[in-house]
Amino acid sequence: MNMYQLLERTAQTYPDNLYLVREGVKYKDFVDLVKARAASLDKAGIKKGDVVGILSHNIPEFPISLFAIWYLGGTVLLLDTNLTPFEYENMTATTKCKIVCAEKSFFFKTDKFTFYDITKKDGKINPDLKPAAVESLDYATLSFTSGSTGKPKVVPLTHFNMVECTNSLESMAEWIRPGDYLYGFLPMYHVFGFGVEILATLHFGAGVLLQPTVNPKEIMADFKKFRPQIIPAVPRLWEVFRNKIIDNVKAQKKWWLVSFILKYGKTLQKIGLGALVRKVQKPILDVFGGRARLLIAGGAATKPEVETFYERLGLTFIQGYGLTETVGPICISKPTKKRFPFAFGAPTLNNECEIRDKNEDGVGVLWLRGHQVFGGYLDNEEANKEIFDERGFFNTGDMVTMDKNGELHFAGRKKQVIVLDSGKNVYPDELEGMYIVLPGVKNVAVFEHKVKGKTVTYGVFSVEEGMTLEKLGAEIAAANKKVASYKWVTHFAMTTEDLPLTSTQKVKHHVVRQNLVEGKYPDRHE
């Protein structure tokens, strides 16, 4: 089965369920919209095997175009909306993408590929245009996981990978039901947003309420009007919501009562005071529309106190673990079990794990194998040899432990990928390659660091004599313009000493970071 066939199956099973909630589009009507878009893209010259980019916010035309490209047998290149023209040109060149479906606001002059207005109105369905014969192992999507410059890592996911991911989501059937509304403000180009807003809704016959911007006023208005049952978000947003709720309650001078209910609510329910508990909880739950049943966190670790807050309000709060290489959620937590520190459950259906090279605390490297695990980076045999063993297990590079219940607990990242508070990933290799060529720079280490309690992308530069912070800052700022702003190094230190290296001449990032903490690099811009 391929992804378009899966859509047709869901539309036949739940024809009158809303898929695009805000627009009032039912599943049966969504299929017609996909067919009409497929006819338009066919006229534009797209054929089976072509790579077609999508560069768009969360608007209805995103999923319509996605399934239309699959209808024609194409592969979708998912493009981050926060990048630069330079990066888009590199990505399309690497993947041989000749056409990009985009909102007009993203258009720029280029001879590398052609833009197609994703909001363009479609004509009639072409009855002679049938779905392409797409095999389960054909590529469905391509995504970049290591930046667009240098030797990029492009993740191809097959239709088999995605269909199996939807099947594995059956483990969430206790909380997601046909006809539910899922709030969709996570970007669909990212694997977390794609997994919940495309795959999960498709599996359960649920609807998605697309929100193209993260505007608090619009989000609150949507919660009130549409009252979604399922709300996924990155941990940072769950923390923001929690803090605002607490601030509002304190402003009403009711925190003493709410904190008492949060602490003793379960006990009060057991002794017959459930009505009181619900009365206190109701105004808070109404913030989410009053029907919220399931809150989902992913993309980074959630603070225990944040998760506890929502669970004590009577909401189910689950966390997942996944990578682009695993179609997102390959592990899902069980809300009935104690999961601190951050735990993300066990592998889902038809997936398995091994923890290797454990230390004395039981912390080891997580390896995964299964139906959701991709087959290797596109045209990058060197990288593939490093991450797959002879038995087909994939090295995630993440450090975990396993508890007595078989649940995995996140212990840290062996890889140096920087995870910002927003959940966005920054790849040090890409930035180091960009900064190492700057005048006066001998070497550089980029890593995750805390500045005034905030996670930032930090750089330590080994420079030649005579370099000043002001001059280095100007060089860095000029280089930053090549990449998206969330990747920028704006906090840095410099030294005229050489950075510590391994025997293979690689920078020892952990030593550099420790030196920074110990104050060995006093020349800083923070």
Where are the regions a protein language model picked out?
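Conserved AMP-binding/adenylation subdomain of ANL enzymes
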Residues: V163-Y181, V191-P283
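AMP-binding/adenylate-forming catalytic core of the ANL superfamily
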Residues: V100, G370, G375-G376, M399-S485
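Conserved AMP-binding/adenylate-forming
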Residues: I231, L276-L408, K414-V417, K442
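Conserved AMP-binding A3 loop
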Residues: K26-K28, A140-T166
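Conserved pre-ATP/AMP-binding loop-to-beta segment of ANL
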Residues: L18, N126-F144, K151, W175-Y181
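Structural core segment of the AMP-binding/adenylate-forming
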Residues: L20, A44, I64-F67, Y71-E135, ...
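Conserved AMP-binding/adenylate-forming core of the ANL superfamily
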Residues: D16-G45, D50-I59, F67, T84-E89, ...
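Conserved C-terminal "lid"/linker of ANL adenylate-forming enzymes
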Residues: I418, A445-K450, A477-E526
